[in-house]
């Protein structure tokens, strides 16, 4: 059996994607204190997503490829395609990635704020509600203390391999198409540094998310036309499916600065059982693992025009 002239090591793909891919927004940058009415916050963040599932499938695929080279005069391409298929699926569900993220938040009042963020090719909107602590800014109050909030984020992305040389050809050969939507619910607590987070604060909490996955694989372009009649029928059948999975996580973040400008550092960890997915040739792959998401960046505040209220009528 022949393939079109293209060859990829799963581990090589993993290394390249580590510096060129995008993933759903998973870093937690908010504190337990939502923005007071009229306040604006925006910033830039650098996020790394390290997935054990992508690493595991890439190592397995590369090891099996090496064993085929050592034990056989020729490589059984149908087996290698199945392994490569598993690597792509693991990568799409939870990629190894480094991304620059831009975000914007606005205080609505009544202890609510809203936000938008863009992480590579993924977009997200969220709303947060503060249920504990003061909701004034440092221009209005000298109060210190603990804060608590809960929110919901909706994100979406259409998956596409990077448009780079032969790596872009992979998607065309496999006829790969995937889109993903996520609903994330963070519960956040924080302790202020100074009154009303004037100098920053430390935040921590837990996260739950549910992902909705749609995917399709149309493999006919993988094989040369002259040998199509030699390819087992099951390897030519298109594969499609819908799935969903839950993720459970915890996080901590710290921001330090003064009033208008802050540096922030965050670390989140997630566990997820992605479930089973149909692969080429009728096989299935079961994926699960953990993800570590460190991030760092800067944020800027613009306060509404308010004055600190006088104390005791003075």
Regions found by a protein language model. Give the residues of each.
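Outer-membrane beta-barrel transmembrane domain signature
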Residues: 45-84, 164-293, 298-313
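Solvent-exposed loop/turn segments connecting transmembrane beta-strands
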Residues: 92-97, 113-126, 179, 196, ...
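Bacterial N-terminal signal peptides that target proteins for export
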Residues: 1-10
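Bacterial Sec-type N-terminal signal peptides, specifically the leucine/valine-rich hydrophobic h-region
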Residues: 16-19
């Amino acid at each position: 059996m022949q393939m079109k002239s293209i060859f990829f090591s799963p581990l090589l793909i993993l290394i390249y994607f580590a510096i060129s891919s995008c993933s759903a927004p998973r870093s937690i940058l908010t504190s337990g204190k939502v923005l007071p009415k009229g306040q604006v916050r925006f910033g830039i963040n650098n996020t790394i997503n390290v997935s054990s599932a992508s690493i595991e499938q890439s190592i397995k695929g590369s090891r099996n490829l090496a064993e085929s080279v050592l034990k056989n005069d020729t490589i059984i391409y149908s087996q290698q395609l199945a392994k490569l298929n598993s690597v792509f699926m693991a990568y799409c569900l939870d990629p190894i990635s480094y991304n620059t993220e831009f975000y914007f938040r606005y205080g609505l009042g009544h202890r609510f704020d809203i936000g938008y963020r863009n992480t590579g090719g993924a977009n997200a909107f969220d709303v947060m509600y503060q249920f504990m602590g003061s909701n004034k800014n440092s221009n209005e109050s000298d109060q210190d203390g603990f804060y608590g909030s809960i929110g919901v984020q909706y994100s979406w992305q259409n998956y596409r391999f990077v448009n780079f040389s032969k790596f872009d050809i992979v998607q065309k050969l496999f006829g790969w198409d995937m889109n993903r939507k996520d609903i994330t619910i963070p519960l956040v607590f924080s302790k202020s540094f100074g009154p009303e987070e004037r100098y920053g604060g430390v935040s921590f909490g837990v996260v739950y998310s549910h992902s909705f996955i749609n995917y399709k694989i149309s493999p006919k372009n993988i094989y040369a036309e002259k040998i199509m009649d030699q390819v087992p029928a099951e390897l030519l059948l298109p594969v499609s499916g819908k799935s969903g999975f839950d993720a459970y996580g915890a996080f901590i973040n710290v921001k330090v600065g003064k009033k208008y400008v802050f540096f922030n550092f965050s670390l989140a960890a997630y566990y997820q059982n992605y479930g089973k997915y149909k692969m080429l040739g009728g096989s299935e792959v079961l994926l699960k693992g953990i993800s570590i998401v460190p991030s760092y960046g800067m944020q800027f505040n613009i306060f509404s025009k308010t004055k600190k209220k006088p104390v005791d009528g003075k």
